[in-house]
């Protein structure tokens, strides 16, 4: 990374966890990601979900077609399939052969937005997981239990004990990405796990703790899943992200929702951060005194874990304050982005 006091130039990053939606909403938000990132792992939780390789290929075409002309050829969507109780080993073989599917996403049924079709019992997926292990197809995990008896702030910690640890014992060769980790326990799990286990960390979980949900009143635009945690957990995530450990890397989990779905009696979970994602990460690393480790976290660790080449082009950020918009277009509606109306310290050059 080449940097001065007022400019950072480094290898173009990738986003290893992104929600793009579809149709006009996708056309609205896709440029924010494509300007900053060369590639992104695209989440499959559409309505209906992306459960076959054929559907993933069609979705990929829609994404590429939605890129504005000035960004054409600059962004590559990396596709995923939504794991269900009925996903077959044959579908995993097709996914691997396609060259476009980079992972299979495990959503415990009901764990987050559009997860109703998710896995009800991981034991039902044994043959499929065996095929994934055989073909070295990564399993991307939303790591929360959905047991109503478990406190919402403990869902990730309990998932490690009840689901993830037994899963890795049963499938010792399975490659797993523990997505959007939020707890000290998850950090420690990855640090002590074999090299086949990695984790993504979001910008919002690095910047916010659970107080942000209630500052001056209820803050629905800070509601996400996994939910924000205590400050001790944010500090653990910050230390992990800036440590240089090769199995922690960037995944924004940027998730656009219209204002009406957030400001609701039963609001949706999700934070939109794609409008300033790499700028937010730079700010976090600068505050931690670890700007020298930003490039590895954002641009090297992810492709290295997935077995993909690192990007060869570069981006620059300049130290310039700019105001984040109060609202962003989302198709025919509006969304409120992370830190709406506030000022960011770094700006995309």
Curated annotation (Swiss-Prot):
UniProt modified residues of type N6-carboxylysine: 105
GO biological process, one term: 'de novo' UMP biosynthetic process
Single GO MF annotation: dihydroorotase activity
Residues bound to substrate: 19-21, 45, 142, 225, 257, 269
Top EC category: hydrolase
Record: active site: 253
Keywords linked to the UniProt accession: Hydrolase, Metal-binding, Pyrimidine biosynthesis, Zinc
Residues annotated for Zn(2+) 2 binding in this entry: 105, 142, 180
EC number: 3.5.2.3
Protein residues bound to Zn(2+) 1: 17, 19, 105, 253
Catalytic activity line of the entry: (S)-dihydroorotate + H2O = N-carbamoyl-L-aspartate + H(+)
Entries under SUPFAM superfamilies matching the protein: Metallo-dependent hydrolases
Cofactor: Zn(2+)
Pathway listed: Pyrimidine metabolism; UMP biosynthesis via de novo pathway; (S)-dihydroorotate from bicarbonate: step 3/3
Cofactor comment text: Binds 2 Zn(2+) ions per subunit.
InterPro entries, alphabetized: Amidohydro-rel, DHOdimr, Dihydroorotase_CS, Metal_Hydrolase
Gene Ontology CC annotation, any one: cytosol
Family stated for the protein in its record: Belongs to the metallo-dependent hydrolases superfamily. DHOase family. Class II DHOase subfamily.
Alphabetical list of NCBIfam families matching this protein: pyrC_dimer
Stated role: Catalyzes the reversible cyclization of carbamoyl aspartate to dihydroorotate.
HAMAP family found in the cross-reference section: PyrC_classII
Assembly mode: Homodimer.
PANTHER family associated with the record: DIHYDROOROTASE
Record protein name field: Dihydroorotase
The gene coding this protein: pyrC
């Amino acid at each position: 990374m080449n940097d001065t006091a007022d400019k950072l130039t480094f290898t173009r990053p990738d986003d290893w966890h992104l929600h793009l939606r579809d149709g006009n909403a996708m056309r609205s938000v896709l440029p924010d990601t494509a300007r900053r990132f060369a590639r992104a792992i695209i989440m499959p939780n559409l309505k209906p979900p992306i459960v076959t390789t054929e559907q993933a290929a069609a979705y990929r075409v829609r994404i590429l077609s939605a890129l504005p002309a000035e960004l054409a050829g600059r962004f590559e969507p990396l596709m995923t399939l939504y794991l269900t109780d009925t996903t077959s080993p044959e579908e995993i073989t097709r996914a691997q052969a396609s060259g476009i599917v980079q992972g299979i996403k495990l959503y415990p049924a009901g764990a987050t937005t559009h997860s109703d079709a998710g896995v009800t019992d991981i034991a039902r997926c044994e043959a499929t997981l065996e095929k994934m292990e055989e073909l070295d197809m990564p399993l991307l995990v939303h790591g929360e239990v959905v047991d109503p008896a478990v406190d919402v702030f403990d869902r990730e910690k309990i998932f490690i004990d009840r689901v993830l640890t037994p899963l890795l014992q049963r499938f010792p060769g399975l490659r797993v990405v523990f997505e959007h980790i939020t707890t000290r326990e998850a950090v420690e799990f990855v640090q002590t796990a074999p090299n086949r286990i990695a984790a993504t960390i979001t910008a919002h979980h690095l910047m916010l703790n659970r107080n942000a949900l209630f500052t001056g009143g209820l803050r629905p635009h800070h509601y996400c899943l996994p939910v924000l945690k205590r400050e001790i957990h944010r500090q653990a995530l910050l230390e992990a992200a800036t440590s240089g450990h090769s199995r922690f890397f960037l995944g924004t989990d940027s998730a656009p929702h219209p204002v009406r779905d957030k400001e609701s009696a039963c609001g949706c979970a999700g934070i939109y951060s794609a409008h300033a994602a790499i700028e937010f990460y730079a700010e976090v690393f600068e505050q931690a005194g670890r700007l020298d480790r930003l490039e590895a976290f954002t641009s090297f660790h992810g492709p290295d874990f997935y077995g993909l080449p690192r990007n060869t082009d570069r981006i620059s950020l300049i130290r310039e304050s700019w105001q984040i918009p109060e609202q962003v277009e989302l198709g025919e509606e509006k969304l409120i982005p992370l830190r709406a109306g506030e000022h960011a310290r770094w700006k995309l050059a």
